[in-house]
């Protein structure tokens, strides 16, 4: 198992912890990207000057070109480009994918200022790569300005230089490919870092991706060349005329046909070299991206116990219970999962007692954070079910009044008493919920990329629509209806536009009825919404995919899966390794949390579209595993409960739990779940 050793625990800010954990990984991935660059340049030079009829001369000329000063200069320039691309990979990575609920939300995300900056920089870097590739190709592609070949141009000294449209075509194609790469980077969630299920050595992971990388680059470059030819056919005359005017160059149509015509674009040599330039660009950029993913998701070992009491900020219990960068939290939970399965010595540190005092601080901190994460998931599932059951309306008692951490900690370790009769079902007990972490929402079709609404941050599943009025009643949080709905106009008006004049205040005073003008405005707005909902183009951009909201609920489920596996493995190992019985004191709370979550998951998967599996793209360089995280989470939850029940067996009958949970626990003991 390939893991990275960590240094001693040390204090510092979250950014310091991030740099200590990821700093050397980032630098190493950039160094390897630059080291692989000469190999890519060599392959490009050999393939760009291919000559099958004279292979000896072809290979000797390629070797001479590689050692020329011109190629060495381009190597240094391309190394700078790779470093800039790697920096953008570091700045834009995320461990939680961004899921857009509609096409308009996706467009809004792409037009975010940060994404636009990313696209423009990549377009400029793509043009720089194309310039280097054009010069290394030599021949008719190496220069922007060439002598005119016409006899009329030789008579006038001012008309002796002409624009080389081949070189211009190269430069513009590089900018187009760079922009297309950036566009696909966000559309396909390529900034998402998927953590490997099985830990492997970095070399093996890169070697496994190498063939797929080359294949993907060749195919994607082919499509980019096709798209660029279409764009250049319609708009190629604009940059050509602008550059000719700015540099006072003439167009030599006698040397070759203009490239913004069908005959000019049917140049096999030009298309081949542009396609090869695109393959070279994509291979180098994708290599940098893959190397960063491999190094960033490598397992990191966090020490369980600090060597000194004042240096504990980088230790596992402290990292889990603090608010570090999200990737550090993911690495800590991954380390918890690994130590719970493969490290008996570190498990003993988790079960150990503090000296002096004899308190299980390590186990308390780790189990508390795991239970908080699982309770958060239960809360999100209940909120989603309530929203689906009430057609977008949701009671605010689950999220408006969050508990403090201390209260959540006390409740998490309190043994549930069967004699207590709750006033609400166990799934919606707010005492079990911890608002510590939240899941990114499905983007609203009208939501701007500059921020999210308060309702979205609280519930994590609500849709925001500017057509819907803000909720006036303090007892309800309402989700604005979609642009199209199957309910009648009166129902829509009653659900989405609660009149402030028709509500009852907290003191019981009735507010006057709405005025005629207010009712007229509401009716006109409903008529406009109904009119727009019948337009196909509006439907195309504003329609919400039901799969998107489902994926958003489980977008960060990977850390919940690790919390489940780590907690269940530790509980199972405590049956034989826990000498002090620290786990037994919290076993009722753990079982209560797991069974409550199991009930919420079972109800969730009965909702429409929840059980439908999206099509799985096999053999693709782009990872889409986040689309099926809900199925992995359900399987991990059931496996975690079975892991505990098979280990403790009939001893669990002595655990104090409610009658409903005792019945569910018995089903697991009898393998009937």
From Swiss-Prot:
UniProt source species: Mus musculus (Mouse)
PANTHER family registered for this protein in UniProt: NUCLEOPORIN NDC1
Known partners and oligomeric status: Interacts with the NUP35/NUP53.
Membrane topology term: Multi-pass membrane protein
Gene, per the UniProt record: Ndc1
Function: Component of the nuclear pore complex (NPC), which plays a key role in de novo assembly and insertion of NPC in the nuclear envelope. Required for NPC and nuclear envelope assembly, possibly by forming a link between the nuclear envelope membrane and soluble nucleoporins, thereby anchoring the NPC in the membrane.
TM spans (from-to): 26-46, 72-92, 116-136, 167-187, 227-247, 262-282
Cytoplasmic side: 1-25, 93-115, 188-226, 283-673
Subcellular location: Nucleus, Nuclear pore complex; Nucleus membrane
Residues in compartment: Perinuclear space: 47-71, 137-166, 248-261
Record protein name field: Nucleoporin NDC1
Organism lineage string: Eukaryota, Metazoa, Chordata, Craniata, Vertebrata
InterPro entries found in the cross-reference section: Nucleoporin_prot_Ndc1/Nup (IPR019049)
Residues annotated with Phosphoserine modification: 407, 438, 444, 470, 473
Family to which the UniProt record says this protein belongs: Belongs to the NDC1 family.
């Amino acid at each position: 198992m390939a893991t990275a050793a960590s240094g001693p625990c040390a204090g510092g800010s979250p950014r310091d912890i991030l740099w200590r954990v990821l700093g050397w990984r980032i630098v190493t991935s950039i160094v390897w990207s630059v080291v692989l660059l000469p190999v890519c340049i060599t392959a490009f030079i050999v393939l760009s000057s291919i000559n099958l009829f004279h292979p000896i001369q072809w290979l000797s000329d390629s070797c001479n070109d590689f050692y020329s000063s011109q190629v060495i200069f381009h190597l240094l320039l391309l190394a700078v480009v790779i470093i800039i691309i790697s920096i953008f990979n570091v700045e834009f990575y995320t461990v939680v994918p961004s899921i857009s609920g509609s096409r308009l939300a996706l467009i809004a995300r792409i037009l975010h200022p940060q994404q636009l900056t990313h696209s423009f920089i990549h377009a400029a870097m793509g043009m720089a790569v194309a310039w280097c590739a054009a010069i290394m190709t030599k021949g008719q592609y190496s220069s922007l300005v060439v002598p005119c070949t016409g006899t009329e141009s030789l008579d006038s000294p001012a008309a002796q230089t002409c624009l080389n449209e081949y070189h211009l075509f190269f430069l513009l194609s590089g900018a187009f490919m760079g922009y297309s790469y950036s566009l696909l980077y966000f559309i396909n969630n390529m900034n998402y870092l998927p953590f490997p299920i099985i830990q492997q050595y970095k070399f093996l992971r890169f070697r496994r991706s190498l063939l797929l990388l080359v294949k993907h680059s060749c195919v994607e470059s082919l499509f980019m060349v096709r798209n660029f030819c279409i764009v250049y056919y319609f708009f190629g005359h604009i940059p050509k005329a602008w550059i000719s005017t700015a540099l006072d160059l003439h167009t030599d149509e006698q040397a070759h046909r203009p490239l913004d015509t069908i005959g000019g674009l049917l140049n096999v040599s030009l298309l081949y070299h542009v396609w090869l330039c695109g393959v070279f660009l994509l291979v180098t950029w994708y290599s940098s991206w893959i190397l960063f993913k491999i190094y960033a998701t490598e397992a990191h070992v966090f020490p369980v116990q600090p060597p000194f009491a004042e240096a504990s900020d980088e230790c596992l219990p402290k990292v889990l219970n603090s608010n570090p960068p999200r990737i550090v939290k993911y690495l800590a939970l991954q380390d918890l999962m690994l130590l719970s399965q493969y490290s008996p010595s570190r498990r003993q540190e988790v079960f150990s007692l503090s000296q002096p005092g004899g308190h299980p601080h390590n186990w308390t901190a780790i189990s508390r954070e795991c239970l908080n994460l699982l309770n958060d998931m239960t809360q999100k599932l209940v909120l989603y079910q309530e929203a689906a059951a009430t057609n977008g309306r949701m009671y605010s008692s689950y999220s408006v009044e969050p508990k403090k951490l201390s209260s959540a900690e006390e409740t998490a370790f309190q043994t549930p008493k069967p004699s207590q009769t709750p006033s609400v079902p166990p799934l919606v007990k707010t005492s079990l919920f911890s608002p510590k972490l939240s899941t990114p929402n499905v983007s609203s079709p009208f939501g701007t990329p500059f921020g999210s609404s308060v309702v979205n941050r609280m519930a994590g599943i609500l849709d925001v629509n500017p057509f819907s009025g803000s909720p006036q009643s303090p007892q309800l949080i309402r989700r604005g209806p979609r642009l199209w709905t199957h309910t009648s106009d009166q129902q829509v008006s009653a659900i989405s536009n609660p009149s402030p004049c028709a509500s009852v205040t907290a003191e019981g005073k009735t507010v006057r009825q709405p005025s005629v003008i207010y009712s007229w405005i509401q009716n006109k707005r409903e008529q406009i919404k109904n009119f727009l909902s019948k337009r196909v183009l509006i439907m195309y951009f504003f329609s919400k995919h039901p799969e998107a909201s489902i994926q958003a609920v489980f977008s960060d489920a990977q850390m919940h899966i690790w919390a489940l596996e780590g907690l269940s493995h530790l509980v199972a190992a405590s049956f034989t390794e826990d000498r002090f019985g620290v786990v037994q004191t919290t076993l009722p709370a753990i079982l209560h949390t797991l069974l409550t979550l199991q009930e919420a998951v079972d109800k969730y998967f009965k909702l429409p579209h929840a059980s439908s599996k999206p099509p799985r793209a096999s053999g693709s360089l782009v990872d889409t595993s986040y689309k099926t995280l809900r199925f992995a989470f359900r399987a991990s939850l059931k496996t975690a409960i079975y892991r505990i029940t098979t280990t403790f067996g009939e001893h669990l009958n002595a655990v104090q739990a409610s009658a409903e949970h005792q019945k569910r626990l018995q089903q697991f003991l009898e393998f009937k779940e």
